[in-house]
Swiss-Prot record:
Coiled coil: none annotated. It is an enzyme of class 2 (transferase). Residues 139-144 are annotated as: Interaction with RNA. This is tRNA (guanine-N(7)-)-methyltransferase. Substrate binds at K137, D169, T206, K207, F208, E209. SUPFAM superfamilies: S-adenosyl-L-methionine-dependent methyltransferases.
Amino acid sequence: MDNQHLRPIRSFVIRGGRMTASQQKAFDRLWPEKGLAVENGLLDLESVFGRRSTVVLEIGFGMGQSLAEMAASEPDADFIGVEVHKPGVGALLRNMEEQSLENIRIFWDDANEVIDKCLPDASLDRVQLFFPDPWHKKRHNKRRIVQLEFVQRIRAKLKSGGVFHMATDWEPYAEHMMEIMSEAPGMENISGAGQFSPRPDTRPVTKFEKRGERLGHGVWDLMFRRVD
């Protein structure tokens, strides 16, 4: 079979749902300035943000509450958010407008496309992947975004000493992440071999997570740094 006709395995599904009126208005007003496009190719991060600063990539920011909170609490850092679901993009833009946040830019696209086509090598201080789809069924495990090949592509975009921070509330996925990350060349567990990390202050606790904690559900953080 001709390889060009093989469809890539996607780690996400496009959910339904329309933007609310307020999300759409925020999208219409802010997207021309705050939105980024894969087709424009490799980013000049200093030009994008108008300064040279710490740069953080968040993959799959959902409705964007946590990303907005992080950007507000780290005004000296610049954040690039990637999300495929338009209502989430609209919600984050509305948050950015309400809070006058200038240190976030957004891709409404597949993170794999963004990583491969838009991010310079050794340009990121931190990559965040919080609560990705766990793909519970065994036959769907191959759809999990955390795979060895993906980690190597993330590593290439991290600066030396840069951190890949993951979090999940699904223990089998946490174990899968640990197995993959422990095998990944050039990545070192900040908390020690085989150890999960305590939640750092840089990751806000979500309402969903607080509810889960009350019900006795666990959350697992993994933090690995690039070593050369």
